UniProtKB/Swiss-Prot annotation:
PANTHER family: SEX-DETERMINING REGION Y PROTEIN, SOX TRANSCRIPTION FACTOR. PROSITE patterns: HMG_BOX_2. InterPro entries: HMG_box_dom, HMG_box_dom_sf, SRY, SRY-related_HMG-box_TF-like. It comes from Pan paniscus. One of its GO terms (biological process) is sex differentiation. This is Sex-determining region Y protein.
Length: 204
Protein backbone atom coordinates (compact mmCIF):
# COMPACT_ATOMS: atom_id res chain seq x y z
CA UNK A 1 0.00 0.00 0.00
CA UNK A 2 1.28 3.42 -0.94
CA UNK A 3 2.12 5.50 2.12
CA UNK A 4 0.51 8.86 2.85
CA UNK A 5 3.79 10.74 2.43
CA UNK A 6 4.48 9.06 -0.93
CA UNK A 7 1.00 9.96 -2.14
CA UNK A 8 1.45 13.56 -1.09
CA UNK A 9 4.85 13.67 -2.77
CA UNK A 10 3.48 12.29 -6.02
CA UNK A 11 0.75 14.93 -6.08
CA UNK A 12 3.29 17.64 -5.25
CA UNK A 13 5.59 16.61 -8.11
CA UNK A 14 2.84 16.08 -10.68
CA UNK A 15 0.54 18.54 -12.37
CA UNK A 16 -2.57 16.49 -11.63
CA UNK A 17 -4.50 18.35 -8.93
CA UNK A 18 -7.87 16.83 -9.82
CA UNK A 19 -10.36 16.13 -7.03
CA UNK A 20 -10.01 12.39 -7.62
CA UNK A 21 -6.33 12.43 -6.75
CA UNK A 22 -6.74 14.67 -3.74
CA UNK A 23 -9.66 12.58 -2.47
CA UNK A 24 -7.48 9.46 -2.20
CA UNK A 25 -4.95 11.06 0.16
CA UNK A 26 -7.12 11.13 3.33
CA UNK A 27 -8.18 7.55 2.61
CA UNK A 28 -4.54 6.44 2.52
CA UNK A 29 -3.88 8.19 5.82
CA UNK A 30 -6.90 6.54 7.48
CA UNK A 31 -5.87 3.11 6.17
CA UNK A 32 -2.30 3.49 7.42
CA UNK A 33 -3.51 4.72 10.80
CA UNK A 34 -5.94 1.80 11.10
CA UNK A 35 -3.30 -0.80 10.25
CA UNK A 36 -0.80 0.64 12.70
CA UNK A 37 -3.36 0.94 15.51
CA UNK A 38 -4.67 -2.56 14.90
CA UNK A 39 -1.15 -3.99 15.01
CA UNK A 40 -0.41 -2.21 18.28
CA UNK A 41 -3.71 -3.33 19.85
CA UNK A 42 -2.98 -6.95 18.96
CA UNK A 43 0.46 -6.70 20.55
CA UNK A 44 -1.02 -5.08 23.66
CA UNK A 45 -3.61 -7.83 24.02
CA UNK A 46 -0.95 -10.53 23.75
CA UNK A 47 1.16 -8.91 26.47
CA UNK A 48 -1.71 -8.27 28.89
CA UNK A 49 -3.82 -11.32 28.10
CA UNK A 50 -6.81 -9.21 27.05
CA UNK A 51 -8.65 -10.71 24.10
CA UNK A 52 -11.88 -8.70 24.09
CA UNK A 53 -13.36 -5.35 25.06
CA UNK A 54 -15.26 -7.00 27.90
CA UNK A 55 -12.03 -7.83 29.71
CA UNK A 56 -11.01 -4.16 29.59
CA UNK A 57 -14.40 -3.01 30.82
CA UNK A 58 -14.39 -5.58 33.65
CA UNK A 59 -11.08 -4.33 35.01
CA UNK A 60 -11.31 -3.68 38.74
CA UNK A 61 -10.83 -0.02 39.61
CA UNK A 62 -8.72 1.21 42.48
CA UNK A 63 -10.54 2.50 45.55
CA UNK A 64 -10.72 6.27 45.76
CA UNK A 65 -8.31 8.09 48.02
CA UNK A 66 -9.22 11.07 50.19
CA UNK A 67 -8.62 13.60 47.44
CA UNK A 68 -10.89 11.83 44.97
CA UNK A 69 -13.58 11.42 47.60
CA UNK A 70 -13.49 15.18 48.20
CA UNK A 71 -13.13 16.21 44.55
CA UNK A 72 -15.95 13.98 43.33
CA UNK A 73 -18.64 16.50 44.27
CA UNK A 74 -16.40 19.54 43.92
CA UNK A 75 -15.57 18.68 40.31
CA UNK A 76 -19.24 18.35 39.40
CA UNK A 77 -20.02 21.65 41.08
CA UNK A 78 -17.17 23.51 39.39
CA UNK A 79 -18.09 22.09 35.99
CA UNK A 80 -21.65 23.32 36.35
CA UNK A 81 -20.52 26.77 37.43
CA UNK A 82 -17.89 27.00 34.66
CA UNK A 83 -19.20 25.07 31.64
CA UNK A 84 -16.44 26.38 29.37
CA UNK A 85 -13.58 25.44 31.67
CA UNK A 86 -11.46 22.53 30.50
CA UNK A 87 -11.17 19.40 32.56
CA UNK A 88 -7.42 19.89 32.96
CA UNK A 89 -7.96 23.38 34.36
CA UNK A 90 -10.61 22.07 36.74
CA UNK A 91 -8.15 19.47 38.01
CA UNK A 92 -5.56 22.18 38.65
CA UNK A 93 -8.05 24.29 40.57
CA UNK A 94 -9.19 21.32 42.65
CA UNK A 95 -5.61 20.37 43.46
CA UNK A 96 -4.88 23.89 44.64
CA UNK A 97 -8.03 24.02 46.77
CA UNK A 98 -7.23 20.63 48.32
CA UNK A 99 -3.80 21.83 49.39
CA UNK A 100 -5.34 24.89 51.02
CA UNK A 101 -7.59 22.77 53.26
CA UNK A 102 -6.51 22.19 56.85
CA UNK A 103 -5.91 18.75 58.33
CA UNK A 104 -9.18 18.96 60.23
CA UNK A 105 -11.06 19.74 57.01
CA UNK A 106 -9.43 16.82 55.21
CA UNK A 107 -9.96 14.30 58.02
CA UNK A 108 -13.57 13.28 57.14
CA UNK A 109 -12.51 12.46 53.60
CA UNK A 110 -9.61 10.34 54.84
CA UNK A 111 -12.06 8.39 56.99
CA UNK A 112 -14.36 7.86 54.02
CA UNK A 113 -11.43 6.71 51.89
CA UNK A 114 -10.41 4.16 54.56
CA UNK A 115 -13.93 2.73 54.56
CA UNK A 116 -13.91 2.42 50.79
CA UNK A 117 -10.52 0.67 50.88
CA UNK A 118 -11.77 -1.82 53.49
CA UNK A 119 -14.84 -2.61 51.39
CA UNK A 120 -12.64 -2.99 48.33
CA UNK A 121 -10.31 -5.47 50.07
CA UNK A 122 -13.29 -7.49 51.24
CA UNK A 123 -14.83 -7.62 47.78
CA UNK A 124 -11.57 -8.21 45.89
CA UNK A 125 -9.17 -10.05 48.24
CA UNK A 126 -6.77 -10.98 45.41
CA UNK A 127 -6.69 -7.53 43.88
CA UNK A 128 -3.34 -6.21 42.70
CA UNK A 129 -2.90 -2.81 41.20
CA UNK A 130 -1.75 -2.92 37.59
CA UNK A 131 -1.12 0.42 35.88
CA UNK A 132 -3.01 0.65 32.64
CA UNK A 133 -0.93 1.31 29.57
CA UNK A 134 -1.99 4.21 27.42
CA UNK A 135 -3.78 2.84 24.38
CA UNK A 136 -3.31 6.02 22.35
CA UNK A 137 0.49 5.75 22.41
CA UNK A 138 1.86 4.04 19.31
CA UNK A 139 5.06 1.98 19.43
CA UNK A 140 8.26 3.62 18.27
CA UNK A 141 8.95 0.82 15.76
CA UNK A 142 5.61 1.34 13.99
CA UNK A 143 6.60 2.23 10.43
CA UNK A 144 3.13 2.06 8.84
CA UNK A 145 2.19 5.59 9.86
CA UNK A 146 4.82 8.34 10.26
CA UNK A 147 4.68 10.36 13.46
CA UNK A 148 4.66 13.57 11.47
CA UNK A 149 3.63 13.13 7.80
CA UNK A 150 4.46 16.75 7.05
CA UNK A 151 8.06 16.36 8.22
CA UNK A 152 8.48 13.15 6.21
CA UNK A 153 7.04 14.83 3.15
CA UNK A 154 9.42 17.78 3.52
CA UNK A 155 12.35 15.40 3.97
CA UNK A 156 11.45 13.50 0.81
CA UNK A 157 11.02 16.73 -1.15
CA UNK A 158 14.37 18.02 0.10
CA UNK A 159 15.99 14.71 -0.80
CA UNK A 160 14.54 14.81 -4.31
CA UNK A 161 15.69 18.41 -4.75
CA UNK A 162 19.19 17.48 -3.61
CA UNK A 163 19.33 14.54 -6.02
CA UNK A 164 17.99 16.77 -8.78
CA UNK A 165 20.71 19.34 -8.14
CA UNK A 166 23.37 16.63 -8.12
CA UNK A 167 22.10 15.25 -11.43
CA UNK A 168 22.06 18.72 -12.96
CA UNK A 169 25.62 19.36 -11.76
CA UNK A 170 26.86 16.08 -13.23
CA UNK A 171 25.06 16.71 -16.51
CA UNK A 172 26.45 20.25 -16.78
CA UNK A 173 29.96 19.04 -15.98
CA UNK A 174 29.71 16.29 -18.60
CA UNK A 175 28.45 18.75 -21.22
CA UNK A 176 31.27 21.16 -20.47
CA UNK A 177 33.88 18.43 -20.79
CA UNK A 178 32.38 17.38 -24.10
CA UNK A 179 32.39 20.92 -25.41
CA UNK A 180 35.90 21.61 -24.17
CA UNK A 181 37.12 18.48 -25.93
CA UNK A 182 36.12 19.94 -29.29
CA UNK A 183 37.92 23.25 -28.81
CA UNK A 184 41.00 23.88 -30.96
CA UNK A 185 44.35 23.85 -29.16
CA UNK A 186 45.58 27.17 -27.87
CA UNK A 187 48.82 28.42 -29.40
CA UNK A 188 50.70 31.64 -29.54
CA UNK A 189 49.40 32.39 -33.03
CA UNK A 190 45.77 32.27 -31.95
CA UNK A 191 43.79 35.44 -32.25
CA UNK A 192 42.74 37.41 -29.12
CA UNK A 193 39.11 36.44 -29.81
CA UNK A 194 39.96 32.72 -29.73
CA UNK A 195 41.99 33.11 -26.53
CA UNK A 196 39.12 34.94 -24.85
CA UNK A 197 36.62 32.28 -25.93
CA UNK A 198 38.82 29.46 -24.62
CA UNK A 199 39.39 31.31 -21.37
CA UNK A 200 35.62 31.70 -20.96
CA UNK A 201 35.01 27.95 -21.37
CA UNK A 202 37.80 27.11 -18.95
CA UNK A 203 36.31 29.31 -16.23
CA UNK A 204 32.96 27.58 -16.59
Amino acid sequence: MQSYASAMLSVFNSDDYSPGVQQNIPALRRSSSFLCTESYNSKYQRETGENSKDSVQDRVKRPMNAFFVWSRDQRRKMALENPRMRNSEISKQLGYQWKMLTAAEKWPFFQEAQKLQAMHREKYPNYKYRPRRKANMLPKNCSLLPADPASVLCSEVQLDNRLYRDDCTKATHSTMEHQLGHLPPINAASSPQQRDRCSHWTKL
